């Protein structure tokens, strides 16, 4: 195939086929605002919405001050072998226990020079959203973070004819679809931003 548009269409179909069964799609988001605060040049919101037919999730959304619509970014948090926080690695959390805030601040300091990517982008005119990947942060094990259990569950996904990494890819795509519905967002200018470890998630 020499035509790039045709190649992209065929390649995408091949990748999606390899990703096995997707979680059920929904547009019945039933968004609930859990908390809000004003930051310097932008507003921070903590939302809850239906990401899939299976999962209702919490997310942080940052919206620049001023008149939109704005370009928008889905922030994919890193793996890092650190499961106690997810979206909080990308956007500085609020309305959380001090332990969570301290955890997030320490991670940002150790891995990102003290800079939260989401807060930086929002201060420069982008709407941003970040959601915990399955098993991270508020979607983690209630028994506590355990990397070996994460590996076990990845194997369980395979036994059920699914792929955990592909499941995350689908949720990333669904998050992008949700982001594009927000009134402050220009749906033609949405992109993904990721740290090094989940870079494969941006390819689909």
Region annotations inferred by a language model:
Residues 26-66:
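N-terminal cap/lid segment of alpha/beta-hydrolase-fold proteins
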Residues 182:
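Acidic-histidine catalytic/liganding microenvironments
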Residues 193-202:
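Conserved small/polar residues in nucleotide/adenosyl-binding loops
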Residues 77-170:
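Cap/lid segment of the alpha/beta-hydrolase catalytic domain
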């Amino acid at each position: 195939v020499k035509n790039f548009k045709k190649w992209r269409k065929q390649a995408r179909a091949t990748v999606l086929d390899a990703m096995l069964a997707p979680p059920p799609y929904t547009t019945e988001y039933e968004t609930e605002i859990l908390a809000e605060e004003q930051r310097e040049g932008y507003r921070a919101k903590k939302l809850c919405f239906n990401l899939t037919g299976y999962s209702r999730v919490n997310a942080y959304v940052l919206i620049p001050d001023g008149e939109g619509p704005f370009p928008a970014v889905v922030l994919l948090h890193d793996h890092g072998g650190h499961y106690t926080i997810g979206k909080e690695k990308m956007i500085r959390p609020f309305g959380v226990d001090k332990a969570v805030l301290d955890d997030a601040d320490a991670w940002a300091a150790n891995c990102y020079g003290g800079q939260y990517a989401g807060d930086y982008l929002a201060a420069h005119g982008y709407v941003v959203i970040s959601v915990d990947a399955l098993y991270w942060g508020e979607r983690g094990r209630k028994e506590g973070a355990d990397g070996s259990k994460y590996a076990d569950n990845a194997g369980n996904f395979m036994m059920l004819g699914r792929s955990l990494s592909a499941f995350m890819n689908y949720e990333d795509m669904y998050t992008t679809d949700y982001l594009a519905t927000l009134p402050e967002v220009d749906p033609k200018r949405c992109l993904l931003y990721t740290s090094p470890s989940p870079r494969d998630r941006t390819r689909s």
